Structures are given as C-alpha cells and as structure tokens.
Amino acid sequence: MLSVAKINENFLNESVDWEFPIPIAYGLGRLNEIGSFCNKFKISNPLIVTDEGSKELPFVNRLAALLTNSSIKSQLFYGISPNPRDDEINAGCIAYRKGDHDGIIAIGGGSALDGAKAIGMTVNSGGSLWDFEYRKPTPVLSSLDCFPTFITIPTTAGTGAETESTAMITDTVKGMKFCLAHLLSLIHI
C-alpha cells in the first residue's frame, strides 16, 4: 500500500502538464524550458515583471540567464509592491512600450502576477486601467491582439493568480482595491 508521503514524493518529482483552463507545466526543472516556451509563443523580447522583494532572488536571475542562453532579449521590471497600485501598472506599461517588448513573463507571488496581468490588460488597449474594472461592462477592443503573450511563473502557493485573468489593483486616488478583468486576456502558460 502506498503512503500519502510516498504519493506526494512521486508527484513532486514528476513533470506534469494539465489545463485549468490555463495550460500548466509543473515539475522540477521546468524553468529550464522557458526558452522553448518563448519560442512556442513567439516571444523574442519579454518584459520580466516581479516585485521589489524578489528582484535579487536566485529564481529571477536564473530566469534572466536562461532567456539570455536561449538568445532571447529581456528586461526586468520590479516596480510592483505587495499590494499593486495603479501608478506601478502605469510605470510597467511605460517600460513595456519603451523596451519594445512582445510579451510578458510574470515571476513571483500573487502580487507580482496581478501587477503583470494588469500591465498586460492595459498596455496596448488604448484605454484606461479602470476600463477593466470587474463591475463595469467588458471593454470592447479593436483587436484581441492588444493583449501581449503572457507567461506566469508562480513562486508561492496559495493565490492561484497564475491560473486566472483577474488582477487586484489599488486605486491610489480612491484608496481602494479593485478587481480588473477581461475574459479574453488569457495567460498562455
């Protein structure tokens, strides 16, 4: 009879792919495949988005090195706080446009992923960040191509931010958090 510990040990050592509905690539060493994922989704110059607390951690440096080794140019944006704010999202959009990026790789916990998703929703939409506020009608966009190709790499467990298109962002004028969403702003993996 297998024990729960043995089942967990086996699961943690396997590479597994599934969808929820976002495709998920799970397993030890899967970060090594980032170059292949970028090639698959035609990302040649991603903006790496993380938070201030994670910018110096080994997994962020490893991600950047793996991209460089795969001949993929990238830039790091680490201006996301533990409670992402609208001004940080605007700064991320400026960095994305200025760097002529063609995709986003979000790495970190729920806040970093939410900040990156908000950047992805708004960077090419031609509208305001708050057009995507959950309680409002879904914005009509001229093209769904306005959403950059998006890869998430969660470094914590719990929020599930890597599997959904919503983002919790603080409105610095109102001093309140709002949920941003667009049904077609999907994470690619």
Stretches with model-predicted labels:
Residues 42-44, 73, 100, 146, ...:
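Short loop/turn motifs at secondary-structure junctions
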Residues 25-26, 77-80, 153, 180:
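Hydrophobic residues at beta-strand termini and immediately following loops
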Residues 55-128:
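N-terminal small/polar loop signature for handling phosphorylated ligands or for N-terminal nucleophile
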Residues 125-187:
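A glycine/threonine-rich phosphate-anchoring loop and its flanking beta-alpha core
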Residues 50, 108, 170:
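Short beta-strand/turn micro-motifs composed of small residues
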Residues 1-77:
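An N-terminal, well-structured beta->alpha segment
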Residues 47-48, 103-105, 151:
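Conserved beta-strand elements of the Class I
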